[in-house]
């Protein structure tokens, strides 16, 4: 299915299980894209871009093995949303506390050892990665080009791009022990 908006593609199947039976749950019509904060609206195309928001459910009616994931039908060009991102995790005490809790909880479960690779996708300013022990191999993927990364002596390897498994395999010999992806689904 094609959109009138060249910045949008549409799901053809469930992102998790591949089911093509997607049932519309909620249609919010066209909305301005989020995270578009600019100095002036004059001659700025980003302030005019809208995208429809349609929630669809991976239907389990015809097959109980389907996953039932609730997801957006429309896929907005990621660069419009993330290349110039305004939010910084470190500026908010609540966010810093929550990210520290994520690290504490995941390390209680997984128990990484010195040298283990830890990846944070959408790592923002690396606040989360800085809560890990410096003996770990810390890797951040962040597509925003306007974010200054915080590296508190942890030697974090930053890729200014979206996560890419081929790029990861080219740069690292071992699988990651922990992969986090906070705030990627809202």
Question: How would you name each of these model-derived features?
Answer:
Residues 113-124:
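Conserved class I S-adenosyl-L-methionine
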Residues 137-142:
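Conserved SAM-binding motif I beta-strand of class I
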Residues 2-92:
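N-terminal juxtadomain amphipathic helix
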């Amino acid at each position: 299915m094609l959109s009138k908006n060249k910045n949008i593609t549409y799901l053809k199947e469930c992102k998790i299980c591949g089911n093509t039976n997607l049932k519309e749950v909620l249609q919010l019509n066209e909305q301005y894209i989020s995270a578009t904060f600019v100095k002036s609206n004059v001659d700025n195309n980003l302030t005019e871009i809208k995208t429809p928001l349609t929630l669809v459910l991976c239907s389990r009616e015809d097959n109980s093995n389907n996953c039932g994931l609730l997801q957006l039908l429309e896929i907005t060009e990621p660069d419009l949303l993330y290349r110039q991102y305004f939010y910084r995790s470190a500026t908010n005490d609540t966010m810093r506390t929550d990210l520290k809790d994520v690290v504490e909880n995941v390390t209680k479960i997984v128990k990484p050892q010195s040298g283990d690779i830890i990846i944070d996708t959408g790592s923002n300013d690396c606040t989360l990665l800085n809560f890990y022990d410096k003996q770990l191999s810390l890797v951040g993927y962040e597509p925003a080009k306007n974010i200054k990364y915080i590296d508190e002596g942890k030697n974090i390897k930053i890729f200014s791009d979206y996560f890419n498994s081929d790029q990861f395999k080219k740069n690292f010999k071992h699988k990651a022990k922990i992969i986090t992806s906070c705030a990627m689904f809202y």
